[in-house]
A protein has these predicted regions:
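Short basic helix-loop element that most often maps to the first helix and adjoining turn
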Residues: 21-36, 97-104
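Short, basic-rich loop-to-helix N-cap that marks the start of a DNA-contacting helix
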Residues: 55-67
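A short, Lys/Arg-rich alpha-helix, primarily the initiator
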Residues: 5-29
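Short, charged recognition helix plus adjacent turn
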Residues: 77-105
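Short alpha-helical DNA-recognition segment
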Residues: 31-49
Length: 105
């Protein structure tokens, strides 16, 4: 079985790198060792290292576990909360009288 190749756009990679750096800084500010955070999050030390590097191959659940250990899980809820583009698209559809199609089962 061949390994699946993941293509990451440069902007996406920068965002992930920044997220990883922010997580690492939060850990260091709390004076928590990587070993302690990994243990409390129930993940391996290499997985935490990958998270702190912004790896796209780590599950979003693992990112959330680390954020919980650091007391930052509420930040996770802010992702896509204010969907400005989605609201504009919805308003544009309402203004033109378009309706959302219902799926018929």
């Amino acid at each position: 079985m061949s390994k699946k190749i993941i293509v990451i756009l440069p902007k996406t990679k920068r965002i992930l790198n920044e997220l990883g750096e922010n997580i690492k800084l939060a850990r260091l500010r709390r004076k928590l060792s990587a070993e302690k955070v990994a243990e409390r999050a129930n993940i391996s030390r290499p997985t935490l290292t990958s998270i702190e590097k912004g790896s796209p191959t780590v599950s979003i659940g693992s990112y959330l576990l680390v954020l919980q250990v650091l007391g930052l899980e509420k930040d996770f809820l802010l992702i896509a909360k204010d969907d400005e583009l989605g609201r504009k698209l919805q308003d544009a559809n309402l203004a033109t009288g378009q309706r959302v199609q219902k799926r018929i089962k």
